[in-house]
């Protein structure tokens, strides 16, 4: 088991990381709603997808702990 996997089996660590990612995602979505040019919107979309993927991976590795 990698160090990250070990950390992700700690409920508090999972909550903390997930909360930080969800806050970052909320900020991105808020920025997207404010608007910007097409290129900036694409960057925000890519970042949003990356954060959503990170959350999904954490939940998968952590075995659904939250």
From Swiss-Prot:
Top-level taxon in the UniProt lineage: Bacteria
GO cellular component: cytoplasm
Subcellular location: Cytoplasm
Keywords tagged on the record: Cytoplasm, Plasmid, Virulence
Residue stretches spanning the membrane: none
Cited InterPro entries: T3SS_PscE/YscE
NCBIfam families the UniProt entry points to: type_III_yscE
Family recorded in the similarity comment: Belongs to the YscE family.
Oligomeric and partner information: Component of the heterodimeric YscE-YscG chaperone. The YscE-YscG chaperone forms a stable ternary complex with YscF/SctF.
Protein name: Type 3 secretion system chaperone YscE
Organism per entry: Yersinia enterocolitica
């Amino acid at each position: 088991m990698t160090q990250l996997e070990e950390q992700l089996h700690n409920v508090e660590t999972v909550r903390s990381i997930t909360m930080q990612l969800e806050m970052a995602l909320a900020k991105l979505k808020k920025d997207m709603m404010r608007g910007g040019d097409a290129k900036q919107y694409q960057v925000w979309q890519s970042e949003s997808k990356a954060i959503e993927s990170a959350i999904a991976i954490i939940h998968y590795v952590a075995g659904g702990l939250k």
